[in-house]
Amino acid sequence: MISLNKKLVLLVGVIFHVAFMWSIFDIYFVSPLIHGMKHHQSTATPPAKRLFLIVGDGLRADKAFEKVRHPTTGESEYLAPFLRSKVMSDATFGISHTRMPTESRPGHVALIAGFYEDVSAVTKGWKENPVDFDSVFNQSRHTYSLGSPDILPMFKHGAEDQSRIDAIMYGHDFEDFTKGSIELDAFVFDHLDEIFDKSKTNKTLDDQLRSDKTVFFLHLLGIDTAGHSYRPYSAEYYDNIKYIDENIEKLVDKVNKFYNDDEQTAWVFTADHGMSDWGSHGDGHPDNTRTPLIAWGAGVNKPIPAFEDKGNHDDYSEVWDLPVKRNDVNQADIASLMSYLVGLNYPSNSVGELPLAFVNATSETKALAIRNNALALVEQYLVKEEQQKGSQIIFKPYPPLSDAGKTIDERLAHIDELIAQGLDQESIVASEELMTYAITGLKYLQTYNWLFLRTLVTIGFFGWIAVAFCSYLLAFVVQSDKPFTTSLPLKGVAYVALAILSGFFVFQKSPLHYHLYAVFPVVFWEAVLQRRTAVAEGISILARRSTSKAPALAAILDIGLSLVLLEAIVYGYFHREIFSVCFGLATLWPFVHNFTVAKREWPTTLAWVVMCAIMSSFTLLEVVKVESIEQILLSGALMLVIGLVFTIHLQRKLALAASTVCVLFAQILLVVATMYFTRESVESLTARNGLPLFSQVGGWISLLLSLAVPFLHFLGSDAKDYRLRLLIIFLAFGPTFVILTISWEGFFYVCFFAILVIWIELETQMRDARVTPQTRADLTPGDFRMALFTFFMSQIGFFGIGNIASISSFSLDSVYRLIPVFDPFSMGALLMFKILVPFAVLSACLGILNLKLGVPPSALFSMVLCVSDILTLNFFYLVVDEGSWLDIGTGISHYCIASGLSLFMMVLEYLSGVLVAGVTIAPHVSKIKKDM
């Protein structure tokens, strides 16, 4: 039985949330990756000896095909006339539909390995991280890859024989978002030319280039870089597409001459992902998931003219004016297509289906190729089935592949019989059906243990909620040192349950951390049930402290309203507008709670109503913002005015020391400096002049000093006043919301801070009106409302300026001012810092609210812990692993954020103590000392 000591509970809570946050990956997203399969060759008679895979990173399908108006020349033109001519006369084309996340690593893995990397792979990152599964490159005789150091190494280092893959890369310093992007692609074309030139004097290289099963991979990052920097409707983005098209035309001519027009070359041009209008990708927006696919050369069909059926064109592609049939594929299908064209084994982990519309071959050849494709998928199912059988006490195989007359062997025999009879089309249909069942069978095996694990996780979360509530009652309500008797039968039941669950995991050969899914539920509920008498006493005390004449009815009503608010917050994760409704209702709170006080303290009440109305507007604004230096500077000016006004006010009110005033003015000047450097950076970047070193260094110095200078206040004695402490904190984070914003985020920061300060004053006035000095520290059921307000404000701190999609589609405009060269981890760290600032502000305000109300330290935080995981449980069941990848990614993000916020509230408690250390409140003098 665990102790419910506050510090121990917090420690256990951290471990529990970290362990159970990972539960969705153990349940919904167990990696489908398996090893040990036999390889199956795509075709014994490959139509091509060599293949060129050209990936225009970040190229949208519409920009590749439609006529656009160039923003510089004003002329309407096709950006890729050579590729367009191929589509019209020599190629099969279509749209390749990608999956989320629409990022470079998963996109290239799908293209080259035919495998949709499981979502848990995001923990791997992509730089220098090898793919641990088979790929087209791995099956080739030799692959020449040229391009970005972010993509090439992962395929080379993940190959069985690394000497099989050449990776020719530029340095990371090439990826400077503030400079021209074309030089990235020029590097690729120039170095490919060098390879062919060297072969004239290098017999070994020449023989290698002329061998069969050779793959050339050109990763062209320029389009993506231009799109991030200047948007996909900019001259830079358009010019980069034109540059690529021109150089592909030159390359095709050079290759044909080198190989003496032997017609043994196949070409595939596509993109790993698209690009949204605001210059980002990552989510499931159609502009991100629709990419061009053009294939031509040996083994590829010629275009089919479009007649009455419009050639499969829809409203999206009709404007491209391409009178040929459009053939869409899933991104993973491209790996199967490439394998067929040069006669490679299908990658053993591929789930792609050979797109026969692209294949120029006899019906028998197609039938055999698609049969081999089905065999490769069936091989995965058989290996997976054997693994699952060995870990189950009772195993039930997948019915469509095990029922009489439908076994895999019987289905394959039927396919072979159809081919032998010359019924090629029927055999293709049968092979495609088998592939479908193999994929759904893999899904069946993946989800075999879902019910058991989800039940354990649910019981665990309810157990944690019960433990948090029990700990709160014992620490702040009962406050009794009276020992309680341990129930030995209950302890025995707990041990037996734990032994059974752990034994089951051992039999299944589950990872060691799975045992935590058994330990936490058993330990939590045993601890709570052992203290059931104390819990009942605590609830009784709270009921007696209730101001309601019918405490039971009031408790039911409060619980109901609390659940409504929590469910509204859940809804707000999908529709931010609900937070505006909540703020609208919050304007009524002072009048409903205590009309007399609301009327008497009308200035504070009016300020509350006004700020609620203003805050409600932020969650109605678009989360995708366009850079506006005017709004950035206006919000900075507002911070400046507030800083000056309150510095003067506090100087008069508190007679601040000269040193304190000097430090405050230094903080104000840092806001001014940040505004200046931000303006200089934006103007230079907008003019395409790159980031001036002076502005970059100045921006970094201003940002870092803004976080360091506040500590100078602790050298004096003035910083103990809570009003001064709030001003110090406000000015400390002000520069962050200047240099790391692109639009109205600075206004949100000011308003968020203001409403928290007003809330502190209003809560204090309400409490002063209903308590005596003797009962001031007593917690009542009504205090749970403050905990809910705190939790609600923590959600506003995040959703006030964005949502999940706005993080995945984070605009790089602001980080360019500090980091112009592509560095995803540093850029991501700056983003996370800006996101966390409102939580730090909330933490400080909550610490001061604790002091002003005179309630025990940590009481409000403890109450928040009792309710926060209700959100987590909601999102646990809202996680999906099928449907659109936008839904899948959103579900994962929501669950992790909800669980992370519960975890983060524990961190905020410590941060609160640090931020308000030494603060004193008058007339009820309390003090928090920094607890190390």
UniProtKB/Swiss-Prot annotation:
UniProt-listed CDD domains: GPI_EPT_1 (cd16020)
Entry keywords, A to Z: Cell wall biogenesis/degradation, Endoplasmic reticulum, Glycoprotein, GPI-anchor biosynthesis, Membrane, Transferase, Transmembrane, Transmembrane helix
Domain of life: Eukaryota
Positions on the Lumenal side per record topology: 30-456, 508-509, 573-577, 625-627, 675-696, 759-786, 850-859, 922-932
An annotated GO BP: GPI anchor biosynthetic process
Residues annotated as transmembrane: 9-29, 457-477, 487-507, 510-530, 552-572, 578-598, 604-624, 628-648, 654-674, 697-717, 738-758, 787-807, 829-849, 860-880, 901-921
Annotated SUPFAM superfamilies: Alkaline phosphatase-like
EC number annotated for this UniProt entry: 2.-.-.-
Metabolic or biological pathway, per its Swiss-Prot or TrEMBL entry: Glycolipid biosynthesis; glycosylphosphatidylinositol-anchor biosynthesis
Principal subcellular localization: endoplasmic reticulum
Glycosylation, residue list: 138, 202, 360
Topological domain spans for side Cytoplasmic: 1-8, 478-486, 531-551, 599-603, 649-653, 718-737, 808-828, 881-900
Location(s) in or outside the cell: Endoplasmic reticulum membrane
Record InterPro entries: Alkaline_phosphatase_core_sf, GPI_EtnP_transferase_1, GPI_EtnP_transferase_1_C, Phosphodiest/P_Trfase, PIGN_N
One cellular component (GO) term of this entry: endoplasmic reticulum membrane
Lipid bilayer topology: Multi-pass membrane protein
Gene Ontology molecular function, alphabetical: mannose-ethanolamine phosphotransferase activity
Family: Belongs to the PIGG/PIGN/PIGO family. PIGN subfamily.
Function statement: Ethanolamine phosphate transferase involved in glycosylphosphatidylinositol-anchor biosynthesis. Transfers ethanolamine phosphate to the first alpha-1,4-linked mannose of the glycosylphosphatidylinositol precursor of GPI-anchor.
Protein name (record): GPI ethanolamine phosphate transferase 1
Lineage: Eukaryota, Fungi, Dikarya, Ascomycota, Saccharomycotina
